[in-house]
Amino acid sequence: MGLPWYRVHTVVLNDPGRLLSVHIMHTALVSGWAGSMALYELAVFDPSDPVLDPMWRQGMFVIPFMTRLGITNSWGGWNITGGTITNPGLWSYEGVAAAHIVFSGLCFLAAIWHWVYWDLEIFCDERTGKPSLDLPKIFGIHLFLSGVACFGFGAFHVTGLYGPGIWVSDPYGLTGKVQPVNPAWGVEGFDPFVPGGIASHHIAAGTLGILAGLFHLSVRPPQRLYKGLRMGNIETVLSSSIAAVFFAAFVVAGTMWYGSATTPIELFGPTRYQWDQGYFQQEIYRRVSAGLAENQSVSEAWSKIPEKLAFYDYIGNNPAKGGLFRAGSMDNGDGIAVGWLGHPVFRNKEGRELFVRRMPTFFETFPVVLVDGDGIVRADVPFRRAESKYSVEQVGVTVEFYGGELNGVSYSDPATVKKYARRAQLGEIFELDRATLKSDGVFRSSPRGWFTFGHASFALLFFFGHIWHGSRTLFRDVFAGIDPDLDAQVEFGAFQKLGDPTTKRQAV
């Protein structure tokens, strides 16, 4: 046929049977990728430490999405929260992966069948005897069916009426588990961090989809609208479908990057804004202050801080710290976290408590500056020692650890104090194993960052695709060179060739 690569899809333009076939094959590829990727991730995933080596540190991409929807058990006998199980049931991680692969195979066979048997009676217009599709009717059918699926997900799966519920956690990502969720019908349902909004919005959107689908099945579009929007042209369907996809991609890029109830930090890692705003640091200090108010010692108060909470307050878990072309998981960057060393408290020789100024997200290096409670600089690690006034040696800074592995240990040796001051720039201090994976010490992004980058990039690409195909279908007669002053009404789009003698003509 000699078509250039960018025009090969024209072969299914007027061939409804094979148009269906290639879409079924596309579904087979998507489902097959999802199932295969899940099996690969399960082969390399280490479930032994859900606190310091969770799925997002290991670079898992599809496991978090399965977990979000209620899958927590493995046929390997482990649970995502760290426990062991004896009866994982059919819908384990492996069960879902297998179901996708089986479904992919069935779609593959169906695609071949529809490619071979393309000339079906159902695609034949009985008035003309030519293949055609009633696109407004198909739109109504798809809208109705997607509405049913959307309503069913919100009303049954999410609420636990028939299904497991979804992953729900506290604001600090400590107590997450799969549980049923009641729909939130009040104004709180519009809070992106309220899980009940997921149920209520799916129920509402599904109901709207069902009603809209029934409307489009029972009401034909007016002739002027049908012709104006080129509703008889399959490229109109392509254009509007691309619009729906790029809009959804932009939305989920936002909910992933900025965080929401649909992207829990236990499954995808914290957001960069939680580091920027000192979100976890504030909660840690609040808990310590509450402990001190209950007459606990400083050591006791810090020892009660969950290791999981302390680990979130570490810059290496910030998805914006990874470079754009740094492949690999977070564990391949700064290493596998082994344990929390504790919270370092720095003091000068007068006994004044000092705080290390933390590194902002987009810095690779940052000066080590220690300030007092009023924000006044009291110590630093100088760049030029000859001019220094606030060096650790001159000010006599010491460090003492509370909580963690070094609880109660103090250091006054300047070299050691400076070492921990540098590490305190990065948040809470953890022991990291860089040997096991030959980690290079350069920060990587989490799946939150990859998902956002991928979906934002493809959304932009698909936006241009929508403009391109929308323009082609709306201005097809202009591009084809039809004279706008033509005094014959040409039903353009029903036939592919200009000058086709069978094209109906009607005097204007």
From Swiss-Prot:
InterPro entries: PS_antenna-like, PS_II_antenna-like_sf, PSII_PsbB
Cofactor note: Binds multiple chlorophylls. PSII binds additional chlorophylls, carotenoids and specific lipids.
GO cellular component terms, A-Z: chloroplast thylakoid membrane; photosystem II
Pfam families linked: PSII
Membrane-related topology note: Multi-pass membrane protein
Transmembrane segments: 21-36, 101-115, 140-156, 203-218, 237-252, 457-472
Record-level Gene Ontology MF annotations: chlorophyll binding; electron transporter, transferring electrons within the cyclic electron transport pathway of photosynthesis activity
Entry's localization field: Plastid, Chloroplast thylakoid membrane
Keyword tags: Chlorophyll, Chloroplast, Chromophore, Membrane, Photosynthesis, Photosystem II, Plastid, Thylakoid, Transmembrane, Transmembrane helix
GO biological process, one term: photosynthetic electron transport in photosystem II
Superkingdom of origin organism: Eukaryota
Keyword Transmembrane: yes
Chief localization: plastid
Function summary: One of the components of the core complex of photosystem II (PSII). It binds chlorophyll and helps catalyze the primary light-induced photochemical processes of PSII. PSII is a light-driven water:plastoquinone oxidoreductase, using light energy to abstract electrons from H(2)O, generating O(2) and a proton gradient subsequently used for ATP formation.
Family matches, as PANTHER family: PHOTOSYSTEM II CP43 REACTION CENTER PROTEIN, PHOTOSYSTEM II CP47 REACTION CENTER PROTEIN
Family to which this protein belongs: Belongs to the PsbB/PsbC family. PsbB subfamily.
Assembly notes: PSII is composed of 1 copy each of membrane proteins PsbA, PsbB, PsbC, PsbD, PsbE, PsbF, PsbH, PsbI, PsbJ, PsbK, PsbL, PsbM, PsbT, PsbX, PsbY, PsbZ, Psb30/Ycf12, at least 3 peripheral proteins of the oxygen-evolving complex and a large number of cofactors. It forms dimeric complexes.
Protein name as annotated: Photosystem II CP47 reaction center protein
Origin species: Lobularia maritima
